[in-house]
Amino acid sequence: MSATAARFPATDVRLSVEQVSYAYAANPLQAPLFTLEATSFQARPGEIVAILGPNASGKSTLLKLISGALAPLSGRVLLNGFPTHSLDPRARARRIAVVQQESRLLFPARVWEFVLQGRHPYSRGLAFESEEDVLIAKNALAQVGAVALNDRWLDQISGGEKQRVILARALAQQPLLLLLDEPTLHLDIGAQVDLLEALQRLARQNRYTVVVVTHELNLAGGYSDQVVLLHRGKSLRVGPPASVYQRELLEQVFQTALTVEMGGSGRPRVSILSDS
């Protein structure tokens, strides 16, 4: 498939990224430096899209454009037909949940307190959380298998457990679109697999549209429905993992000799070739 994704019927599309570009200038006398050029893809409810590429390929810029934190220089990002950057912060937070690489605590908190922060977009003034908010937060913890962590202090749980709790806070926002920036960073292999399997299950069951930024080839290929392959700010290919994972293309992007094999499930598996 080419760098422009195949189009679905309009009624099926939740997220539409249409020829989006972004650039910045270090100073007014310099020509703009493009960090992302003419990128397009569409995603439906229940789908996982992986934005894949090496460092400085434009992955985080694209995620910020999708979230509405940045306005595109050209093109548009539509969520259910509405430009994401034109939504006010409260409306945006009710529709889009963003899980950053690092979630830092400003003060000590128990897990349940942290997850309840996801209900902030629905709060009214200085009122305390409602019974409904508490139930939604508890359900979010249950969805990620973290109910047993409810009363634990956030700084006293493992990295894998913390990522599940951070995901629960995002789910408590009841979003249509879930955006995650390198969610498996610093996790061991087992925790990575657990997190991606949870995301896949949640996307299917709750009809979330999920966009994950990653540089992990096998995680992207193993769990996503679509891959957007970026290189130096350009979208080189968009499509199902099996169509994107071409050896020559991946070697060009990642500057590494590798092999690509298709497993029994039709999912690609990448191995790095040793120099020896």
Predicted regions and their residues:
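Conserved catalytic motifs of ABC-family nucleotide-binding domains
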Residues: Q174
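Catalytic Walker B motif of ABC-type/P-loop ATPase nucleotide-binding domains
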Residues: L178-E182
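ABC ATPase nucleotide-binding domains
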Residues: V253-S276
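Conserved ABC ATPase signature
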Residues: W153-I157, E161
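Helix-to-loop junction immediately C-terminal to a conserved catalytic motif
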Residues: S67
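The feature captures the beta-strand-to-loop junction immediately N-terminal to the Walker
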Residues: L52-P54
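Conserved ABC transporter NBD signature motif
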Residues: G75-P83, R92
